Regions:
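Activation-segment/catalytic-loop signature of the eukaryotic protein kinase fold
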Residues: 112
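AlphaC helix of the protein kinase catalytic domain
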Residues: 131-142
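Conserved activation segment of eukaryotic-like protein kinases, specifically the C-terminal portion
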Residues: 202-216
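AlphaC helix of the eukaryotic protein kinase fold
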Residues: 68-100
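Conserved short submotifs of the Hanks-type protein kinase catalytic core
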Residues: 116-130
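Protein kinase catalytic-loop region centered on the HRD/HxD motif
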Residues: 156-166
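Activation segment signature within eukaryotic-like protein kinase domains
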Residues: 150-151
Length: 219
């Protein structure tokens, strides 16, 4: 996810379809590519309106689409058009969902919009590592006091989500981001579902071994 960015573009990160540095998206100027995932690209950018660095996530399912005209995307095969549009709707839905909430341990969406046959999400530029990465660097189990501090922030974020009738459904060490400065941030609402709108509809199973709730295995 885009939130896992550092303060500078990651060395060695590149992609043939990435927007080059200097590209303008509205008031934002792309400075470099931070990361590439299966469904999106994350850029470091500069907001010329508010004069601050931000992270921009672009909907880019690399298996389905590529860059065709300047900043625009094109679906590689007509048979993938429906899947591409469904993913785009999901991306925009996630942005709208995140924009509803305001909590220091939830990703804040400053702005999102659709253009160029894709969509963009503007967020803070976080610096740090995931809980999973931090644990891998530890030679011994982390102290209980440290764990409690991390979990307290995560539980606070979940409380806000649950009050908003929203389920995260993908809590795991790689979705908890430990900032260099600031509280832990809960990542990846791509698996989230709005509880009210989903009543009577089938959830898409999102399972993570050792972390998925047991009731998901029967869905």
């Amino acid at each position: 996810m885009i939130e896992r960015s550092s303060q500078t573009p990651a060395a060695g990160v590149s992609h043939v379809d990435a927007l080059p540095p200097g590209t303008r998206l509205a008031e934002f100027e792309i400075l470099g590519l931070l990361g590439v995932g299966g469904f999106g690209m994350v850029y470091k950018a500069f907001d010329h309106s508010l004069h601050r660095a931000v992270a921009i996530k672009e909907y880019m399912p690399t298996a389905l689409a590529g860059r065709v005209h300047g900043q625009s995307l094109g679906v590689r095969s007509s048979s993938d058009q429906q899947t591409f549009q469904a993913g785009l709707a999901s991306f925009v839905g996630e942005a709208r969902l995140l924009a509803q909430f305001d909590h220091p341990s939830l990703v804040k969406v400053f702005r999102f919009w659709e253009a160029n046959n894709t969509a963009y999400m503007v967020m803070p530029l976080y610096s740090g590592i995931t809980f999973k990465q931090a644990r891998a660097q530890m030679r011994t189990p982390p102290p209980e006091a440290w764990l409690r501090k991390v979990l307290w922030s995560v539980l606070g974020a979940l409380r806000v989500l649950h009050y908003g009738k929203t389920l995260h459904r993908d809590i795991s060490p790689d979705n908890i981001f430990l900032q260099d400065y600031g509280p832990p941030v809960l990542l990846d609402l791509g698996a989230a579902r709005h509880a009210i709108n989903d009543q009577g509809r089938q959830h898409t199973a999102v399972l993570k071994v050792n972390y998925a709730p047991i009731e998901q295995y029967s869905e």
